[in-house]
């Protein structure tokens, strides 16, 4: 496995600074994440999790922290071994100010990892900062989370990481087809009504088929304004989807309906699915009423 075709990210930093939140953000960005991994095991993990096993993910993210004995030295050795394997991991270092970390620990009431060595919280925070200084100095990306909410942090990680790794499509799109006579899906964010298109139900040869069948799809898209509607819908979505991404949204449900949810909505939704996949979005489709229509 080479870095060029399978990105590897190592996320580390100060305890309480938000490493777990960052891992969750990267997981939402379609990375496979492993938290609490000893630094010494990073090369083995990269070897085990090959491209075929993670074919549906953007890359591999390994979360590590100071709880491991000799963490800094073990991380240095693992980075050297990974580079020898042709893998150049990007290191993301998460930090926050001492005042913010103190406040977070007071809120969560969890002990700092170094308090087990007999230190008080303030001393533990300072010692951790000193011990991890070499890692911070060589990190590809340093993120100070002191002033960020979870939603702010999501936007920052997506924006900053995109500048290093390239464009990341964070938005997951679910296309749902339905029949209006059965009701509009309650989870829909956008709803489009296709009942203005010619209905294959009234064509005897097409009635028993569904929008998954080529004759129906051809009829729906080529008769009336099917292709025109699809083109205008794509133009609209190509404008709208990046706006949702910029706001940190990671899920959007597009509902496409016709009378019974069997012919017109299915044909157009399948064409929309193919088009959006070409734009590298994570897209799924669900035909809720196709067998009822």
From Swiss-Prot:
InterPro entries: P-loop_NTPase (IPR027417), RapZ-like (IPR005337), RapZ-like_N (IPR053930), RapZ_C (IPR053931). The keyword rRNA-binding does not apply. GTP binds at residues 65-68. Keywords: ATP-binding, GTP-binding, Nucleotide-binding. It holds the Pfam family PapZ_C. The keyword Heme does not apply. It comes from the Bacteria. GO terms for molecular function: ATP binding; GTP binding. Gene3D superfamilies: P-loop containing nucleotide triphosphate hydrolases. ATP binds at residues 13-20. Displays ATPase and GTPase activities. Belongs to the RapZ-like family. HAMAP family: RapZ_like. This is Nucleotide-binding protein DvMF_0424. It comes from Nitratidesulfovibrio vulgaris (strain DSM 19637 / Miyazaki F). The lineage of its organism: Bacteria, Pseudomonadati, Thermodesulfobacteriota, Desulfovibrionia, Desulfovibrionales.
């Amino acid at each position: 496995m080479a870095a060029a075709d399978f990105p590897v990210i190592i996320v580390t930093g100060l305890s309480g600074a938000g490493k777990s939140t960052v891992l969750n953000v990267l997981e939402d960005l379609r990375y496979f994440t492993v938290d609490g991994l000893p630094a010494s095991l990073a090369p083995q993990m990269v070897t085990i999790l090959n491209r075929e096993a993670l074919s549906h993910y953007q890359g591999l993210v390994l979360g590590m922290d100071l709880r491991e004995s000799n963490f800094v030295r073990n991380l240095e050795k693992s980075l050297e071994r990974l580079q020898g394997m042709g893998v150049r991991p990007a290191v993301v270092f998460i930090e926050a100010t001492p005042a913010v970390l103190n406040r977070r620990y007071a809120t969560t009431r969890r002990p700092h990892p170094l308090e087990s060595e007999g230190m008080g919280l303030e001393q533990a925070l300072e010692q951790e900062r000193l011990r991890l200084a070499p890692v911070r100095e060589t990190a590809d990306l340093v993120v100070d989370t002191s002033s960020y909410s979870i939603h702010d942090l999501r936007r920052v990680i997506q924006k900053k990481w995109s500048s290093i790794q390239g464009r990341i499509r964070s938005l997951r799109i679910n296309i749902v087809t339905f029949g209006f006579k059965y009701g509009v899906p309650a989870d829909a964010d956008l709803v489009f009504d296709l009942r203005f298109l010619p209905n294959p139900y009234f064509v005897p040869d097409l009635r028993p088929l569904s929008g998954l069948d080529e004759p129906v799809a051809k009829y729906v898209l080529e008769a009336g304004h099917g292709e025109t509607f699809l083109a205008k819908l794509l133009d609209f979505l190509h404008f709208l989807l990046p706006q949702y991404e910029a706001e940190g949204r990671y899920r959007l449900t597009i509902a496409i309906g016709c009378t019974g949810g069997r012919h017109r909505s299915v044909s157009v939704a399948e064409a929309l699915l193919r088009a959006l996949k070409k734009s590298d979005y994570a897209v799924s489709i669900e035909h809720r009423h196709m067998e009822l229509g």
